[in-house]
Amino acid sequence: MNSQGFVESRNIRSIEINTDVVVIGGGLTGVCCALSAARLGSKVVLVQDRPVLGGNASSEVRLWALGATSHMGNNNRWSREGGIIDEIMTENLYRNREGNPVIFDTVLLDMVMHQPGITMLLNTVVHSVGKKDKRTISHVVAHNAINETSYRISGKYFADCSGDGLVSYLAGSPYRMGSEAREDYDEGFAPDRDIYGELLGHTILFYMKDTGKPVKYVAPQFALKDVERHISKIHNDQYFSIHHHGCKYWWIEYGGRLDTIHDSEDIKRELWKVVYGIWDYIKNSGKFPEMANYTLEWVGTIPGKRESRRMVGLYTLNQRDIIERHTHYDAVAYGGWAIDLHPSNGVYASGRACNQWHSKGVYQIPYRCYLGDHIDNLMFGGRIISTTHVANGSTRVMCTSACGGQVIGTALALCNRYDCKPADFVDPDRIKVLQRELLSWGHYIPGLELKDDSDLLNTAEVKASSVYLFDGYRHNGRFAPLKFSTAALFPVEAGKMPAISLNVKASEPTVLVVELRHAVCGNGYTPDGLIEKKRYELKEGDNEIKIEFETEIPRRQYIFVCFMANDKVMMPQSNDLITGTTTVLNQINLAVSNYGRQDPPAGIGIESFEFWCPLRRPESKNIAFRLSPALHIFSPEFMKNGVMRPEGGTNAWAASNEDSDPSLTLSWPTEQTISELRLFFDTDFDHAMETVQMGHSESVMPYCVRDYRVTDGEGKVLARVEGNYKSVNRLKFNPPAVTGKLSIHLRKPSQEVPATLFHVMVK
């Protein structure tokens, strides 16, 4: 028993913690930051003000995490984020393909709790910052009301992943809030501040469920009345449907005309008013009798935020960087979501709930956007990085932010290792150290190759048991109507295009138009360049056609063989799935403002182009055709090019389908001491792994090698893995293997998918 008498006053418990890296904010950005820093040997304290990790992706808000893939509704092929956020997404898919937000919470908690070197403080709110001097943060002070504890957390380095930039703000860093003028950064899409507004608002979502019996609903007094008059989108089936819930109600947005930090409680109450009012309309207007058995299962208790402070960094990313896809010497991350701005009146605005304009491909984000010029031991990540309001419309999404989290966690861990400042990596030579470290963990930076002098692969002779020759896709016996223009997308080397043969059906005599296209901008996937056009007269029934193009292809690149829409034509289908090749369609995806093509108003600095996007499995099928001669688009030599996904080519080795024991052998003239092997597999970087609600048809990507073993020169098994589903496998040998040869034996995933590998690292 603990019994205490009266005293004049008491203080709550106080704990002091000293660490290397302090990460403030436990959203996806903060989680990736903390994990990356800890894996590189730094002691980390992760301070999160909520009871769970994940931020807007958590069960408290329930927004799906997305990034460059944009629901697979843009031209960013193979663009899903790599590195730690890829680990999170593939783990969630494996455990939780149905998209339960509560399960996603556990995925994040598991990863952080089982990572040595991280101290996690949940329900802990930072409220003040201490400084050693004008340019150096010494500590933060935080309070946990649940355990009545005050924490004084001292660190060498600080990462502000708080969403609102609280630590940067308290430390005195410069920031912006709202929109720049058009002339400030030559941004044609910068909004009219008075008419459109200059801040994005908050959102609260809700879930419903069918109880199987009638459920009445009595709305709270604060619920919005006369919803049809106040919310025009109720009359627009693109937005409102009684079958929608969760993320489909992203347009329930409010607060863009207010202070999205200090007015957040008022904004939340207004959003509750709207949510409960909409549910009252659904249940009690008498217009939807089919909803009699439905009840509210969940309503968000905190709003999901889109925008508040943006810190001023050494570089400010802007609209032109995104649309023109500028190259930066210090590129460390990338984006690909559309520039997505919302009217500040939010749910009460008339007209569209958002204005999305896409770039033709992914764009680089420079390191200089993650640090400022005033605090030497501070970096910032997430939606608060140094961008304009317009650029923030793209960079703010969670998977893009998470990429940046890994960047700043890695940078601060390297600072800790080398006893330097984050600004030191702005140097053109030093930035290569950071870029190399990021790439070695599977992090993707468009246009960069991993070059590591310490990698024993550099001096190895690489041989394969066989090599897959791409000669097209086998027919599965089924046909599908050519309702939309459809293209086979695959890479070719310089030289003459191979002939393409296929069997198509026609319901009546008609003409099939075939266009050979490519991306004018280089290594993109927007087929805006017409190379050659063919026309084929089809008779009713079966037609065997052979397409022979005259054009010489000048360089290694991706090409599109486009079969233009004709509803009288049936195209042959295939179940084959071959890495770095796919089938794309010129169709509509309203979820990301994809109407088949993009035609922006004149003068806003956005390009017009068509969208050619894949379908999702299981609906997605490749076009069955035969190539002659077959293409040599896979090679064991690609193991050395340092690119771990399709970019300009497959960048992969794939074994022949007839190979009963696909293997890759690395040989050295003398014995090597090998302590670590990293293998980089194909987990279909084209598939958007939305974390919640949508659900997926697979828990493991069908391209991924599940089972493999590694042997030395004597045939001794050094490692055996069964049931793999991850992109990067890191194998540690203790004691180290001493051998002059390593063989990696893969089992092909299925009869439709050859065994494939992107890259090998040997340490």
Give the label of every model feature segment.
Residues 15-27:
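Beta1/beta-strand and adjacent pyrophosphate-binding region of the FAD-binding site
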Residues 475-491, 544-545, 651-670:
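Short beta-strands within extracellular/lumenal beta-sheet-rich domains
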